[in-house]
């Protein structure tokens, strides 16, 4: 019975010919180590990892995975290949370097190291790290229809996802934040842009039961003017939601600490409700053994 849900690892000779839905940083640089990691076009133009995105390119080809590493200051394109069991990650445009502690090397070289292969997730639930494919022997579980909520989108431009610095009141994100403000949250945080865990993070503290609820909201704009059951939109937003799971395996105070750093940097005020001081207090409560519950929402 234990082996029924075991994970099987298979060495592959080439990139599998199936749809990839997300790419993630290696798990062992998330959390504790990320605060000491910087990426940039040169040693004088470095950004912390919390401000860097890694994502699949819209243009894919058989036998390779094209992906992008970007921040608000640069965008770099890479190609990930497996040829006869050997991994290559090559820069296509705008080469980047990575700084860890006192060590600096090219991002291509770093990502080809055994411990630092990116994680690629495929639509069938398998993952690829380096030349190893992980197959999870879990039974498919149907999503509970009762958990699907229907919202009123009148007045919202469903092709416009982000509210931006100007807080566009016709955007999907603005609408979501407005609805969350009607609920009993202590913190509502705009985490949008490169390096995000989610588009919106909402936090509620229960001091009586010593619990902290953290809700992550992943948003996806519609590719067309009218709503529809478009599988491409579903793949995209589910890929985003799966990426944040790696964060949920780190210590909760790492997520809150990361929010504090992002909230204190840049011109954008990310606190839609609550303050940096309140978030700092919540982080201390989490460190003092408050139980944390995570809920992932797709909008």
Stretches with model-predicted labels:
Residues 1-163:
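Long, charge-dense tracts
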Residues 4, 60, 129-131, 149, ...:
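Residue-identity detector for glutamine
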Residues 147-195:
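Catalytic-core elements of nucleic-acid end-processing and repair enzymes
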Residues 285-291:
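Short, basic/hydrophobic alpha-helical segments
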């Amino acid at each position: 019975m234990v082996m029924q849900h075991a994970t099987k690892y298979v060495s592959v000779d080439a990139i599998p010919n199936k749809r990839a839905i997300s790419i993630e940083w290696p798990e062992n640089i998330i959390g504790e180590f990320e605060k000491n990691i910087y990426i940039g076009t040169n040693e004088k133009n470095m950004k912390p990892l919390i401000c860097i995105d890694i994502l699949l390119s819209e243009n894919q080809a058989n036998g390779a995975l094209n992906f992008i590493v970007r921040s608000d200051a640069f965008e770099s394109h890479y190609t990930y290949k497996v040829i006869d069991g050997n991994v290559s990650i090559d820069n296509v445009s705008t080469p980047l370097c990575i700084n860890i502690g006192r060590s600096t090397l090219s991002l291509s070289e770093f990502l080809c190291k055994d411990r630092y292969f990116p994680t690629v997730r495929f639509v069938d639930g398998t993952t690829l790290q380096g030349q190893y494919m992980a197959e999870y022997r879990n039974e498919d579980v149907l999503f509970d229809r009762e958990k699907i909520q229907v919202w009123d989108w009148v007045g919202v431009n469903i092709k416009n996802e982000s509210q931006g610095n100007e807080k566009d009141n016709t955007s999907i994100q603005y609408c979501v934040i407005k609805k969350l403000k009607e609920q009993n949250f202590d913190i509502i945080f705009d985490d949008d842009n490169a390096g995000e865990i989610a588009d919106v993070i909402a936090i509620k503290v229960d001091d009586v039961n010593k619990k902290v609820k953290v809700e992550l909201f992943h948003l996806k704009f519609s590719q067309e003017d009218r709503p529809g059951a478009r599988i491409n939109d579903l793949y995209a937003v589910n890929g985003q939601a799966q990426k944040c799971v790696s964060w949920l395996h780190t210590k909760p105070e790492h997520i809150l600490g990361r929010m504090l750093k992002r909230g204190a940097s840049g011109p954008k005020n990310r606190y839609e409700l609550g303050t940096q001081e309140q978030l700092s207090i919540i982080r201390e409560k989490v460190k003092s053994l408050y139980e944390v519950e995570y809920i992932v929402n797709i909008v």
